C-alpha cells in the first residue's frame, strides 16, 4: 500500500494509518534546493522569506518498526534517535522503535538533510504510535522550519515554493507559493563530497554577525521573485526563470560572502564549474543554502545529458561530483506494511 500524506495546510491529520494493523512504515523524503532569501532587512517585521524547490534525488529513506527498545542503524542514526526522544518528551509518543536508515541525503551539503530525516522518522513513528498532528507542528516539535519552510513544504507537497518569512510566531513561515516545476526541466547538481557548508552553532553565529540587508536590495529580491522567477516558471519560461535565479543568487551571495571567506560560494571550485555550465547553455546557477552544493537549470534531459558528458571529467578532476536531478512535484511517500503482510 502506497500512501502520500495530505497537505498540512488542508488542516488534515498528520497520522492516518491504523496503528493496530500496521507493522512497519517506510518513508521516502526528497532533497530540496534553497535558492535564496527575500528579506534579510526585517523592517516590516518579518525576516528571511525563502525560495526553493523539491528535487527527486538524492533522497532519504527510512523504515521504522515497533520494538522492545529504541535502536537505529545507518547514516545519521543518532539524529534519528534524537527525533524519537524529542517526540516522546513533547508529545508522549508511546512505545519504542527500531529505525533503519536505508539511505540519507548528504549531511550539511545544502540539501535539507536534517529536516527530511526528522520528518521521515516522525511520520513513521507517530503513525505507528497512533498520534495525529499537523505537519507544521511536527516541524516545530522537531526543531525544523526555524527560518525557512522550504524543507517542510518540500516534504509535504513538493514543487517550487516561496514562503513569507518569520514573524513573531514560533511556527514555520507560511507558504505563499507552491506550484509544480515543469516536468521536462532538469537540474545539474554539483556536489563536493569532502566539504560541508556552515551549520550548527557556526550557522547561528554567522546569521547573528551579518549586517542588515539594504532595504532596496530586499525590495529588489521580492520584485525578482514575484514578477520574474515565479511567473516565468509557471509559464515554462526557463530563460526568464534562470535570469531571475542567477541575479537572486548574486545578491544573496554577496550578502553572505563575509561568512564564506569573502565569496558567494562556500567552495569556489563549485562556483567555477557552475559558471562553465552556464557558458555551456545552463541557466539559473547558484549555491543551495550554505552549500557546498551548486546547481544549474536546463530545459530538457537531452541538454542535461550533453552538459553532463561535457563536464563530468572536469568535475572529477576537481574532486567534485556532477549529477542530474529533476524537480519533484509530490511530497514524501509512505509505504505501509501491515501485520498480515509481515506476519508480526
For each predicted feature, which ranges?
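Short beta-strand-to-loop capping motifs
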Residues: 64-66, 74, 192, 296-300
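Alpha/beta catalytic cores of group-transfer enzymes, especially the acyltransferase/condensing modules
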Residues: 135-185, 271, 285-287, 291, ...
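Active-site rim beta-loop-alpha module in soluble metabolic enzymes
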Residues: 192, 197-265
Amino acid at each position: 500500500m502506497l500512501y502520500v500524506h495530505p497537505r498540512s495546510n488542508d488542516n488534515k491529520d498528520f497520522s492516518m494509518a491504523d496503528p493496530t494493523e500496521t507493522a512497519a512504515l517506510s518513508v521516502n523524503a526528497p532533497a530540496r534546493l534553497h535558492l535564496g532569501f527575500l528579506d534579510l532587512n526585517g523592517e516590516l517585521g518579518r525576516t528571511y522569506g525563502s525560495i526553493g524547490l523539491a528535487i527527486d534525488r538524492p533522497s532519504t529513506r527510512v523504515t521504522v518498526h515497533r520494538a522492545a527498545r529504541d535502536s537505529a542503524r545507518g547514516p545519521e542514526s543518532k539524529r534519528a534517535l534524537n527525533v524519537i526522544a524529542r517526540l516522546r518528551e513533547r508529545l508522549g509518543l508511546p512505545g519504542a522503535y527500531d529505525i533503519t536508515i536505508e539511505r540519507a541525503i548528504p549531511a550539511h551539503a545544502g540539501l535539507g538533510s536534517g529536516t527530511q530525516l526528522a520528518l521521515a522518522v516522525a511520520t513513521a513513528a507517530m503513525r505507528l504510535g497512533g498520534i495525529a498532528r499537523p505537519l507544521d507542528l511536527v516541524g516545530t516539535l522537531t526543531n525544523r522550519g526555524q527560518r525557512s519552510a522550504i524543507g517542510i513544504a518540500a516534504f509535504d507537497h513538493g514543487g517550487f515554493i516561496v514562503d513569507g518569512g518569520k514573524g513573531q510566531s514560533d511556527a514555520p513561515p507560511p507558504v505563499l507559493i507552491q506550484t509544480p516545476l515543469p516536468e521536462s526541466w532538469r537540474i545539474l547538481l554539483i556536489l563536493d563530497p569532502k566539504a560541508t557548508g556552515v551549520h550548527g552553532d557556526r550557522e547561528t553565529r554567522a546569521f547573528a554577525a551579518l549586517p542588515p540587508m539594504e532595504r532596496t536590495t530586499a525590495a529588489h529580491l521580492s520584485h525578482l521573485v514575484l514578477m520574474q522567477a515565479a511567473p516565468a516558471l509557471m509559464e515554462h519560461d526557463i530563460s526568464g526563470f534562470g535570469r531571475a535565479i542567477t541575479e537572486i543568487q548574486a545578491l544573496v551571495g554577496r550578502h553572505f560572502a563575509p561568512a564564506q571567506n569573502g565569496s558567494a560560494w562556500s567552495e569556489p571550485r563549485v562556483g567555477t564549474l557552475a559558471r562553465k555550465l552556464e557558458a555551456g547553455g545552463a541557466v539559473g546557477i547558484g549555491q543551495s543554502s550554505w552549500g557546498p552544493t551548486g546547481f544549474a537549470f536546463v530545459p530538457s534531459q537531452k541538454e542535461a545529458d550533453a552538459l553532463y558528458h561535457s563536464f563530468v571529467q572536469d568535475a572529477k578532476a576537481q574532486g567534485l561530483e556532477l549529477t542530474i536531478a529533476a524537480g519533484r512535484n509530490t511530497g514524501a511517500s509512505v509505504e505501509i506494511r501491515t501485520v498480515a503482510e509481515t506476519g508480526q
